[in-house]
């Protein structure tokens, strides 16, 4: 078929099925790199592709899933050689049926900063190399699949968009709780990928058809009309022996439900074979894809936080240097600790979005804003409003932002619109339009509305839909232009009613120069909400203003059952005189922790600098062991418990571990200065088994275990069984952790366990990895199965203390 036919939705398009299990079944040996099949067993690889083509697959995914420089290191072949040979095999198989050939690209196998160590641009460069090779080899499209990190997916999409002109398909893998391994939601994935220009969006791997169905329904509601949706489930759920629980007939029967929800492309992933695709083809060929009716909604997001702007939404204003000497100094010094503390404090006070401004004379705004975004993403999961009119600053900040942000702002000047709107479109950002132009701010509502009309028309022409446009009719100070308040609100109402866009105001501007500013701010906020205000840029640490917002949400049925209102005020006693809560400082940051423990709270919040400062302060009054046992370990336990319950996600877990590590450095220095032995809770050896180059999960386990006080020897990835045995023998470790992500390397995990038993070493073995289950772990001889890093830490505490 022609690639353009993939998008016409006249019939279902069929993707192929599993590759790794097919290679394994046809002779791939344990430890042999699947990516080299095109060079080492080309006839076998071509035969697999041919079987899928004959089964009815319209798109054949080349065997390039792991063909990147990181995973091919030491194999003796270049990325270009492997990609070219792999696409040639798929192209040969496609000759008889006319199937399209996709350059298949999977994750790089490392977490990106801040959760890991791989820089965003380094990830981009890795993907770009593969994509250039695939385009040169004649691929028809780029297929990014099995992604779990939205940041990595963004790097891959940008690499595809900027290095070839091929269509780009994207797919993420979700766990049973409806989030990816790193905590990304279906909705955040949908709006981010579509905003970056993905031509088709889907879900693959991890689960079977029945389990993926509710997530696919959410995806269909979230992806814009015109963007096709596809699904590639596994052949059900894994059995203890590594097989899957559905046969082709059962798989096709469960898949049939997808025909009615808006999906237009179907295929299979792990465990599926040409027989599965043939049965899928028989089932879906008589059917026509149902219309997909997405919900047109205004939204902003980070991977783990999806904010739908369907009512009043609070934008924290405190990370703006105007009138804030302490923040100005922090920006000049390149000190991220203070703005990060402000971010956390605003989030806990009720902000849903954070305004971020680095516009300060005498500093490099572009570099500062870029670094500020990186630092803030490490400590908060709130979406950011990038507050700048500097195209370079916005370009750099938008590029490294993880999710869908909002840009503040453009105005009615054509020159500004021409520079900023294309950036918003490229990076999928929403945009704020200020109702002013070279003539200044019109004094009347009619004048501001006219500018708003021009901005909306220009944004639409740039490809930005109305749901991503926010108009700021501008708040003037009542002390200087008293009549301006009414004009602002009238213009706001007209924009909302007649233009069909969202609205935004900097609320606190109303009271400059007048006493008791809180009275004016709160009253104006209430008036603006009644007029249709969507985004209120304000100080969320002001109790009266947040009370007005929460009460308004109750009375307009935005806060159903008054849930949030009750949670905020159930234990509050209204007094005649109230004291205003200010943004938390290092000294105040522990107020919510047991005994007002600043170190506990700094670690819980993932604030590295504050954790170090709090540890230094605690060590002047307490013994190091007391600081560890009373503050650090309980904080890690609290974050770990949240991770288990699904209220804390992987990025926050790792940031808490990083903050704890900063505190541990202070504790170690104190112990060393005193001449005491530091000691260890116990020694643990961990490794990714022979033939497996995936070590994300293993690295996370190491970080968590180290922060609980264990001495961890990390042998790395692709580790021979003999190295593990020798390491345990030399260290005397009582616990060994083994990781495997690929089904083809699980036999090597079993071989490593058998080698440890044969050596009669006094140790227990815990295993983990995406392909493992408790039953499978038991069958290969492991003592324990650990589903995640928290489970590993719990087991270590149980066995080693």
What are these regions, as identified by a protein language model?
Residues 1-801:
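Domain-level signal for soluble alpha/beta catalytic cores
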């Amino acid at each position: 078929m022609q690639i353009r036919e993939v998008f016409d939705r006249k019939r279902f398009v069929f993707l192929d099925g599993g590759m790794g299990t097919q290679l394994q079944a046809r002779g791939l040996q344990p430890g042999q790199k699947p990516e080299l099949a095109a060079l080492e067993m080309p006839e076998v690889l071509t035969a697999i592709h041919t079987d899928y083509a004959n089964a009815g697959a319209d798109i054949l995914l080349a065997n390039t899933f792991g063909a990147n420089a990181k995973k091919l290191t030491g194999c003796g072949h270049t990325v270009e050689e492997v990609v070219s040979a792999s696409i040639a095999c798929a192209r040969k198989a496609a000759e008889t049926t006319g199937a399209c050939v996709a350059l298949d690209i999977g994750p790089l196998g490392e977490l990106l900063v801040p959760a890991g160590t791989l820089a965003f641009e380094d990830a981009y460069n890795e993907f770009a190399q593969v994509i250039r090779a695939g385009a040169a080899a004649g691929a028809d499209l780029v297929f990014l699949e099995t992604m779990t990190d939205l940041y990595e997916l963004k790097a891959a999409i940008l690499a595809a968009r900027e290095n070839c002109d091929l269509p780009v398909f994207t797919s993420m893998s979700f766990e049973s709780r409806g989030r990816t391994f790193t905590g990304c939601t279906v909705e955040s994935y949908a709006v981010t990928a579509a905003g970056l220009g993905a031509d088709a969006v889907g879900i693959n791997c991890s689960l079977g058809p029945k389990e993926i169905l509710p997530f696919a329904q959410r995806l269909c509601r979230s992806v814009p009309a015109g963007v096709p949706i596809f699904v590639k489930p596994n052949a059900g759920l894994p059995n203890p022996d590594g097989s899957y629980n559905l046969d082709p007939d059962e798989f096709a029967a469960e898949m049939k439900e997808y025909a009615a929800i808006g999906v237009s492309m179907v295929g299979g992933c792990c465990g599926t074979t040409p027989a599965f695709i043939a049965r899928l083809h028989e089932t879906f060929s008589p059917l026509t894809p149902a219309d997909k009716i997405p919900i047109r909604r205004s939204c902003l997001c980070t991977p783990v936080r999806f904010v739908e702007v369907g009512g009043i939404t609070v934008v924290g204003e405190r990370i703006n240097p105007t009138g804030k000497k302490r923040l100005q100094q922090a920006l000049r010094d390149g000190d991220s600790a203070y703005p990060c503390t402000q971010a956390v404090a605003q989030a806990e006070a009720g902000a849903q979005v954070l305004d971020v401004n680095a516009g300060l004379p005498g500093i490099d705004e572009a570099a500062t804003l870029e670094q500020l975004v990186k630092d803030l993403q490490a400590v908060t999961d709130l979406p950011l409003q990038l507050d700048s009119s500097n195209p370079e600053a916005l370009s750099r900040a938008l590029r490294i932002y993880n999710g869908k942000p909002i840009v503040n702002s453009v105005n009615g000047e054509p020159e500004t619109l021409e520079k900023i709107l294309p950036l918003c479109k490229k990076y999928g950002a929403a945009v704020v339009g200020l109702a002013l132009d070279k003539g200044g701010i019109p004094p009347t509502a009619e004048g501001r509305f006219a500018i708003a009309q021009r901005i909306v028309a220009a944004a639409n022409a740039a490809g930005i839909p109305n749901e991503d446009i926010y108009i700021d009719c501008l708040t003037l100070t009542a002390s200087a232009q008293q009549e301006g308040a009414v004009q602002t609100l009238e213009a706001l109402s007209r924009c909302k009613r007649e233009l069909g866009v969202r609205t935004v105001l900097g609320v606190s501007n109303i009271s400059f120069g007048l006493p008791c500013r809180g009275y004016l701010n709160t009253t104006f906020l209430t008036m603006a909400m009644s007029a249709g205000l969507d985004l209120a840029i304000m100080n969320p640490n002001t109790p009266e203003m947040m009370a007005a917002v929460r009460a308004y949400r109750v009375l307009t049925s935005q806060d159903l059952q008054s849930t949030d209102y009750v949670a905020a005020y159930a234990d509050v006693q209204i007094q005649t005189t109230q004291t205003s809560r200010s943004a938390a400082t290092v000294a105040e940051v522990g107020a919510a922790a047991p005994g007002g423990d600043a170190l506990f709270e700094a670690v819980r919040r993932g604030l590295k600098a504050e954790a170090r400062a709090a540890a230094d302060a605690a060590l002047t009054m307490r013994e190091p062991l007391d600081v560890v046992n009373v503050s650090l370990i309980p904080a890690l336990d609290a974050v770990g418990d949240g991770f288990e319950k699904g209220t804390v996600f992987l990025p926050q877990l790792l940031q808490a571990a990083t903050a704890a590590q900063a505190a541990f450095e202070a504790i170690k220095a104190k112990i060393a200065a005193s001449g005491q032995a530091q000691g260890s809770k116990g020694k643990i050896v961990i490794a990714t088994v022979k033939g497996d180059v995936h070590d994300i999960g293993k690295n996370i386990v190491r970080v968590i275990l180290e922060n609980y006080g264990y001495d961890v020897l990390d042998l790395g990835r692709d580790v021979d069984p003999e190295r593990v045995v020798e390491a345990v023998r030399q260290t005397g470790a009582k616990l060994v952790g083994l990781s495997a992500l690929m089904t083809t390397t699980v036999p090597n995990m079993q071989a490593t366990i058998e080698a440890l038993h044969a050596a009669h070493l006094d140790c227990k073995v815990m295993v983990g990895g995406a392909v493992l289950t408790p039953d499978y772990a038991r069958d290969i001889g492991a003592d324990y199965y650990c589903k995640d890093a928290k489970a590993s830490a719990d087991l270590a505490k149980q066995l080693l203390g």
